[in-house]
């Protein structure tokens, strides 16, 4: 016999599909939705559907946007590209208000153990941007872990023939950590003290 009636069980099941949300947390979320006024629940549902309908990837950098090209790509210095693993890394860096260039979101890193190779992430698109000839520096801001380092070294090797400076974020970001969770001061210092690859 099921513990929850079908609509509640279904909602709990959907919430538990989110990263970091176990059954207990999913139950709390479901109970909260049940207790919400219908207008708030409808606004919550509309926000979810709005994201799915309106948000797409920038055709230049791969970050989230509602347009063909994101605001960063439309208004920033294209001679400086910061390469990141995923869009949430862009958000973490943008919070600092330090970086004045544009981004390139790989949507992953090279991870042979997970079956992710160079052709599975947006490396070809980065090389196409470099072929335009306007880029002076590429900052590789992948996470300081095995996959992030492997991706950084692979990119440095590919970028070398373009006569573009390739740098990596400096020390201060702990090995094995994720950029998204790095505090603002540490992340800002890592940008200022970035290293050549």
Q: Across the structure, where does each feature detected by a protein language model lie?
A:
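Cys/His-rich Zn2+-binding cysteine-cluster or related metal-binding knuckle/ribbon modules and their
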Residues: 2-8, 17, 25-90
């Amino acid at each position: 016999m099921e513990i929850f009636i079908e609509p509640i069980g279904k909602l709990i099941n959907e919430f538990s599909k989110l990263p970091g949300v176990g059954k207990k947390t999913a139950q709390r979320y479901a109970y909260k939705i049940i207790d919400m006024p219908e207008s708030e629940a409808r606004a919550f549902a509309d926000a979810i559907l709005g994201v799915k309908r309106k948000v797409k990837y920038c055709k230049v950098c791969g970050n989230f946007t509602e347009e063909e090209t994101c605001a960063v790509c439309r208004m920033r210095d294209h001679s400086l590209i910061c390469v990141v693993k995923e869009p949430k890394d862009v958000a973490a860096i943008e919070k600092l208000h330090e970086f004045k260039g544009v981004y390139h979101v790989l949507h992953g890193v090279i991870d042979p153990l997970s079956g992710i190779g160079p052709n599975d992430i947006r490396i070809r698109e980065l090389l196409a941007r470099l072929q335009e000839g306007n880029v002076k520096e590429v900052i590789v801001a992948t996470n300081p872990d095995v996959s992030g380092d492997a991706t950084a070294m692979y990119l440095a090797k590919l970028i070398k023939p373009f006569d573009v400076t390739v740098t990596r974020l400096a020390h201060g970001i702990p090995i094995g950590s994720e950029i998204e969770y790095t505090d603002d001061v540490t992340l800002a210092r890592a940008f200022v003290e970035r290293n050549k690859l």
